[in-house]
Amino acid sequence: MKILFIGGTGLISSACSELALASGHELYILNRSLSTKYPLPAGAILLKGDIHADEAHLASLLADQHFDMVVDWIAYTVEDVERDIRLFSGRINQFVFISSASAYQKPPKYYLITEETPLENPFWKYSRDKITCENRLMQEYHDHKFPVTIIRPSLTYGPSQIPLIGASWAHPYAVVDRMKRGEKVIVPGDGTSLWVLTWNADFARGLAGLLGNEKAIGEAFQITSDEVLSWDQIFLETYQALGV
Protein backbone atom coordinates (compact mmCIF):
# COMPACT_ATOMS: atom_id res chain seq x y z
CA MET A 1 0.00 0.00 0.00
CA LYS A 2 1.07 3.57 -0.64
CA ILE A 3 0.96 5.51 2.63
CA LEU A 4 1.62 9.15 3.52
CA PHE A 5 2.56 10.13 7.06
CA ILE A 6 2.30 13.83 7.83
CA GLY A 7 4.91 14.15 10.56
CA GLY A 8 6.17 10.61 10.83
CA THR A 9 9.33 11.13 12.90
CA GLY A 10 7.92 11.65 16.39
CA LEU A 11 7.76 9.46 19.47
CA ILE A 12 4.76 7.42 18.30
CA SER A 13 4.92 7.89 14.55
CA SER A 14 8.56 6.79 14.25
CA ALA A 15 7.64 3.28 15.41
CA CYS A 16 4.73 3.25 12.97
CA SER A 17 7.03 4.35 10.15
CA GLU A 18 9.46 1.52 10.91
CA LEU A 19 6.69 -1.07 10.98
CA ALA A 20 5.09 0.20 7.77
CA LEU A 21 8.40 -0.12 5.95
CA ALA A 22 9.13 -3.54 7.47
CA SER A 23 5.70 -4.68 6.25
CA GLY A 24 6.59 -3.76 2.68
CA HIS A 25 4.49 -0.63 2.30
CA GLU A 26 5.56 2.31 0.16
CA LEU A 27 5.91 5.07 2.76
CA TYR A 28 6.06 8.79 2.06
CA ILE A 29 6.80 11.16 4.93
CA LEU A 30 5.86 14.83 4.73
CA ASN A 31 7.70 16.99 7.25
CA ARG A 32 10.38 19.63 7.67
CA SER A 33 13.12 17.00 8.11
CA LEU A 34 14.32 18.57 11.36
CA SER A 35 13.99 15.73 13.90
CA THR A 36 17.20 14.70 15.64
CA LYS A 37 15.66 12.12 18.01
CA TYR A 38 13.96 10.22 15.20
CA PRO A 39 15.51 10.86 11.77
CA LEU A 40 13.87 9.78 8.52
CA PRO A 41 13.88 5.96 8.44
CA ALA A 42 15.76 4.20 5.67
CA GLY A 43 13.45 3.36 2.80
CA ALA A 44 10.98 6.19 3.36
CA ILE A 45 10.48 8.84 0.68
CA LEU A 46 10.73 12.41 2.00
CA LEU A 47 8.37 15.13 0.85
CA LYS A 48 9.97 18.16 2.46
CA GLY A 49 7.59 20.88 3.55
CA ASP A 50 5.86 22.54 6.47
CA ILE A 51 2.26 21.36 6.62
CA HIS A 52 1.34 24.37 8.76
CA ALA A 53 2.94 27.03 6.56
CA ASP A 54 2.46 26.81 2.80
CA GLU A 55 -0.62 25.05 1.46
CA ALA A 56 0.14 26.03 -2.14
CA HIS A 57 3.56 24.36 -1.92
CA LEU A 58 1.98 21.28 -0.38
CA ALA A 59 -0.61 21.10 -3.13
CA SER A 60 2.16 21.14 -5.73
CA LEU A 61 4.09 18.42 -3.87
CA LEU A 62 1.00 16.22 -3.81
CA ALA A 63 -0.41 17.16 -7.21
CA ASP A 64 0.29 13.86 -8.99
CA GLN A 65 0.02 11.58 -5.97
CA HIS A 66 -2.75 9.21 -4.93
CA PHE A 67 -2.31 7.56 -1.56
CA ASP A 68 -4.15 4.58 -0.18
CA MET A 69 -3.90 6.09 3.29
CA VAL A 70 -2.88 9.39 4.85
CA VAL A 71 -2.10 9.64 8.57
CA ASP A 72 -1.85 13.16 9.98
CA TRP A 73 0.16 13.00 13.19
CA ILE A 74 0.34 16.76 13.68
CA ALA A 75 -3.19 18.12 13.16
CA TYR A 76 -4.17 20.06 16.27
CA THR A 77 -6.84 22.58 15.24
CA VAL A 78 -9.93 22.66 13.07
CA GLU A 79 -7.97 24.79 10.60
CA ASP A 80 -5.52 21.91 10.24
CA VAL A 81 -8.23 19.40 9.39
CA GLU A 82 -9.99 21.84 7.05
CA ARG A 83 -6.70 22.04 5.14
CA ASP A 84 -6.45 18.24 5.07
CA ILE A 85 -9.99 17.97 3.73
CA ARG A 86 -9.10 20.40 0.93
CA LEU A 87 -5.86 18.61 0.09
CA PHE A 88 -7.09 15.02 0.15
CA SER A 89 -10.81 14.89 -0.66
CA GLY A 90 -11.37 12.48 -3.53
CA ARG A 91 -7.70 11.46 -3.64
CA ILE A 92 -7.31 8.91 -0.85
CA ASN A 93 -8.95 5.73 0.39
CA GLN A 94 -8.50 6.46 4.10
CA PHE A 95 -7.58 9.45 6.25
CA VAL A 96 -6.41 8.74 9.79
CA PHE A 97 -6.67 11.55 12.32
CA ILE A 98 -4.56 11.17 15.45
CA SER A 99 -6.66 12.54 18.27
CA SER A 100 -6.01 12.03 21.99
CA ALA A 101 -7.43 10.06 24.91
CA SER A 102 -7.24 13.34 26.82
CA ALA A 103 -10.38 14.34 24.90
CA TYR A 104 -12.47 11.99 27.02
CA GLN A 105 -14.79 13.28 29.73
CA LYS A 106 -13.01 15.05 32.61
CA PRO A 107 -13.67 14.28 35.37
CA PRO A 108 -14.92 10.87 34.22
CA LYS A 109 -18.25 9.61 35.50
CA TYR A 110 -17.03 6.02 35.25
CA TYR A 111 -13.53 4.68 35.77
CA LEU A 112 -13.49 2.51 32.62
CA ILE A 113 -12.94 4.59 29.47
CA THR A 114 -14.20 3.25 26.14
CA GLU A 115 -14.64 4.79 22.70
CA GLU A 116 -18.23 5.57 23.70
CA THR A 117 -17.18 7.72 26.66
CA PRO A 118 -18.30 11.33 26.02
CA LEU A 119 -15.71 13.79 24.74
CA GLU A 120 -15.50 16.70 27.15
CA ASN A 121 -12.41 18.23 28.74
CA PRO A 122 -12.87 21.73 30.19
CA PHE A 123 -9.34 21.78 31.60
CA TRP A 124 -7.14 21.62 28.49
CA LYS A 125 -7.51 23.58 25.26
CA TYR A 126 -5.42 21.00 23.37
CA SER A 127 -8.07 18.38 24.14
CA ARG A 128 -10.98 20.67 23.25
CA ASP A 129 -9.32 21.45 19.92
CA LYS A 130 -8.95 17.72 19.23
CA ILE A 131 -12.66 17.26 19.96
CA THR A 132 -13.51 20.03 17.50
CA CYS A 133 -11.31 18.36 14.89
CA GLU A 134 -13.04 15.02 15.42
CA ASN A 135 -16.48 16.60 15.08
CA ARG A 136 -15.52 18.38 11.86
CA LEU A 137 -14.08 15.25 10.29
CA MET A 138 -17.10 13.15 11.22
CA GLN A 139 -19.35 15.83 9.74
CA GLU A 140 -17.35 15.59 6.50
CA TYR A 141 -17.67 11.81 6.60
CA HIS A 142 -21.45 11.93 7.00
CA ASP A 143 -21.97 14.76 4.48
CA HIS A 144 -19.43 13.86 1.80
CA LYS A 145 -18.09 10.38 2.66
CA PHE A 146 -14.64 11.70 3.56
CA PRO A 147 -12.98 8.40 4.59
CA VAL A 148 -11.85 9.28 8.11
CA THR A 149 -10.69 6.98 10.89
CA ILE A 150 -10.04 8.53 14.31
CA ILE A 151 -7.44 7.15 16.72
CA ARG A 152 -7.07 8.25 20.33
CA PRO A 153 -3.69 7.33 21.83
CA SER A 154 -3.15 7.50 25.56
CA LEU A 155 0.18 7.95 27.35
CA THR A 156 2.68 6.41 24.94
CA TYR A 157 6.38 6.06 25.58
CA GLY A 158 9.48 4.98 23.70
CA PRO A 159 13.28 5.10 23.81
CA SER A 160 13.35 8.88 24.23
CA GLN A 161 10.55 9.34 26.75
CA ILE A 162 10.06 8.06 30.29
CA PRO A 163 6.37 7.23 30.95
CA LEU A 164 5.99 9.30 34.09
CA ILE A 165 3.61 12.16 34.80
CA GLY A 166 5.74 15.03 36.05
CA ALA A 167 8.68 14.27 33.79
CA SER A 168 9.86 17.20 31.70
CA TRP A 169 9.21 16.89 27.96
CA ALA A 170 12.52 18.65 27.28
CA HIS A 171 14.42 16.73 29.97
CA PRO A 172 12.56 13.41 30.35
CA TYR A 173 15.25 11.72 32.43
CA ALA A 174 15.16 14.29 35.24
CA VAL A 175 12.82 12.08 37.31
CA VAL A 176 15.13 9.11 36.78
CA ASP A 177 18.06 11.21 37.95
CA ARG A 178 16.18 12.10 41.15
CA MET A 179 15.44 8.42 41.77
CA LYS A 180 19.10 7.51 41.31
CA ARG A 181 20.12 10.22 43.78
CA GLY A 182 17.52 9.12 46.34
CA GLU A 183 15.52 12.34 46.03
CA LYS A 184 11.74 12.58 46.37
CA VAL A 185 9.56 12.45 43.25
CA ILE A 186 6.00 13.65 42.67
CA VAL A 187 3.40 10.92 42.09
CA PRO A 188 -0.10 11.83 40.81
CA GLY A 189 -2.78 11.95 43.51
CA ASP A 190 -2.23 9.43 46.27
CA GLY A 191 -0.58 6.97 43.88
CA THR A 192 -3.52 4.56 43.72
CA SER A 193 -5.31 5.94 40.65
CA LEU A 194 -5.15 3.63 37.63
CA TRP A 195 -3.54 4.26 34.28
CA VAL A 196 -2.46 2.47 31.12
CA LEU A 197 0.89 2.97 29.38
CA THR A 198 1.58 2.06 25.76
CA TRP A 199 4.97 1.23 24.23
CA ASN A 200 5.25 2.97 20.85
CA ALA A 201 5.92 -0.27 18.93
CA ASP A 202 2.74 -1.78 20.43
CA PHE A 203 0.78 1.25 19.24
CA ALA A 204 2.26 0.70 15.77
CA ARG A 205 0.85 -2.83 15.62
CA GLY A 206 -2.59 -1.50 16.54
CA LEU A 207 -2.42 1.14 13.82
CA ALA A 208 -1.31 -1.45 11.26
CA GLY A 209 -4.54 -3.37 11.80
CA LEU A 210 -6.62 -0.29 10.99
CA LEU A 211 -4.78 0.88 7.86
CA GLY A 212 -6.63 -0.27 4.78
CA ASN A 213 -9.47 -1.68 6.88
CA GLU A 214 -12.78 -0.58 5.34
CA LYS A 215 -14.61 -1.35 8.58
CA ALA A 216 -12.54 1.37 10.30
CA ILE A 217 -13.93 4.16 8.11
CA GLY A 218 -16.20 6.49 10.06
CA GLU A 219 -15.13 4.98 13.38
CA ALA A 220 -13.00 6.02 16.37
CA PHE A 221 -10.56 3.75 18.19
CA GLN A 222 -8.31 4.01 21.20
CA ILE A 223 -5.00 2.14 21.05
CA THR A 224 -3.55 1.35 24.46
CA SER A 225 -2.09 -1.52 26.43
CA ASP A 226 -4.27 -4.04 28.26
CA GLU A 227 -2.12 -3.80 31.41
CA VAL A 228 -3.64 -1.57 34.09
CA LEU A 229 -1.27 -0.18 36.73
CA SER A 230 -1.52 2.27 39.59
CA TRP A 231 0.81 5.26 39.49
CA ASP A 232 2.65 3.87 42.50
CA GLN A 233 3.29 0.70 40.49
CA ILE A 234 4.44 2.67 37.46
CA PHE A 235 6.96 4.66 39.49
CA LEU A 236 8.11 1.53 41.33
CA GLU A 237 8.63 -0.36 38.05
CA THR A 238 10.74 2.53 36.79
CA TYR A 239 12.77 2.59 39.99
CA GLN A 240 13.38 -1.15 39.91
CA ALA A 241 14.44 -1.02 36.26
CA LEU A 242 17.24 1.35 37.30
CA GLY A 243 18.74 -1.31 39.56
CA VAL A 244 19.39 1.15 42.38
Residue ranges and their predicted role:
Residues 3-23:
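N-terminal Rossmann NAD(P)H-binding glycine-rich loop of SDR-like oxidoreductase domains
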Residues 126-130:
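Active-site YXXXK catalytic motif of short-chain dehydrogenase/reductase
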Residues 136-165:
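Conserved beta-loop-beta element that borders a ligand/cofactor-binding pocket
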Residues 209-244:
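Mid/C-terminal beta-alpha module of Rossmann-like enzyme folds, strongest
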